[in-house]
């Protein structure tokens, strides 16, 4: 969606400084189509992979104008986002607290078409660039002090974030 907004509306795109090269596609830390096809024997994986491909999941375009979200820029944005680096899904992945809401991105999800259950959890390991690091990063989220979680996939979760982290790491 960020690619579309940037191209269509010239929307500025900000992310953690460590994620900027990834957003610009200087490199790509994403599951490969070959790795997905190796999972085709699993229920739902082939259908999901085909749907994602039709929705542009194979597009490798970056966002050339991506800029680092510095504290100075964050101060000028609605909600004044505060960065919580959560590397693992990608090496520069970052979650943000905005207006007392944790926007976790892919650090923690509450549902996914390939997940076996709903509720706080980590993505299947093949979707993380460094799965052990992704799991360690969850501890940082537990300190967010918010009661609302917006995940990268799944429904909004309301409750102590420390509880969400416990469920995700169980």
Placement of each model-derived feature along the sequence:
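Active-site metal-binding motif and surrounding structural segment of the metallo-beta-lactamase
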Residues: 1-19
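Short, glycine/charged-enriched secondary-structure capping and boundary segments
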Residues: 3-7, 27-30, 99-101, 117-119, ...
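Short, flexible active-site loop motifs that bind/organize anionic cofactors or intermediates
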Residues: 10, 64, 124
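Short, hydrophobic beta-strand segments that form beta-sheet elements in well-ordered domains
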Residues: 13-14, 68, 149
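Short, acidic/turn-prone active-site loops that include or flank metal/cofactor-
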Residues: 17-21, 108-110
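Metallo-beta-lactamase
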Residues: 20-87, 91-161
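C-terminal/domain-terminus segments
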Residues: 41-45, 149-170
């Amino acid at each position: 969606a960020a690619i579309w907004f940037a191209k269509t509306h010239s929307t500025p795109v900000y992310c953690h400084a460590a994620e900027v090269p990834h957003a610009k596609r200087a490199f790509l830390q994403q599951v490969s189509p070959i790795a997905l096809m190796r999972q085709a024997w699993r229920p739902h994986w082939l259908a999901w992979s085909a749907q994602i491909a039709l929705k542009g999941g194979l597009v490798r375009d970056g966002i050339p104008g991506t800029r680092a979200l510095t504290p100075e820029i964050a101060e000028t944005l609605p909600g004044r986002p505060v960065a919580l680096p959560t590397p693992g899904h990608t090496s520069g992945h970052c979650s943000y607290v905005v207006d007392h809401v944790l926007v976790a991105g892919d650090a923690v999800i509450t549902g996914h078409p390939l997940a076996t259950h709903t509720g706080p959890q980590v993505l299947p390991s093949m979707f993380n660039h460094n799965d052990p690091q992704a799991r360690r990063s969850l501890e940082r989220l537990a300190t967010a002090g918010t009661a609302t979680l917006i995940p990268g996939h799944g429904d909004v979760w309301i409750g102590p974030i420390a509880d969400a982290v416990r469920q995700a790491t169980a």
